[in-house]
């Protein structure tokens, strides 16, 4: 599932910002081929 990728990304058009359990902002790459 591309949406659940856990690879961190720098500013990227395909990124998705999420909150970690600690409340920190974490960025994930959506494209599966970039995980």
From Swiss-Prot:
Post-translational modification: Contains disulfide bonds.
Membrane-traversing stretches: none
Record keywords: Cleavage on pair of basic residues, Disulfide bond, Neurotoxin, Secreted, Toxin
Disordered, as annotated region: 1-35
Principal localisation: secreted
Localization, UniProt: Secreted
GO cellular component, one term: extracellular region
Tissue: Expressed by the venom duct.
GO molecular function, one term: toxin activity
Domain of life of the native organism: Eukaryota
Stretches of the chain forming a coiled coil according to its record: none
Residue ranges with Basic and acidic residues bias: 21-35
Cysteine disulfide links: none
Name of the protein in its database record: Conotoxin TxMEKL-0422
């Amino acid at each position: 599932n591309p949406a659940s990728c856990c690879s961190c990304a720098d500013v990227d058009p395909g990124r998705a910002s999420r909150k970690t359990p600690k409340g920190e902002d974490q960025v994930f790459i959506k494209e599966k081929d970039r995980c």
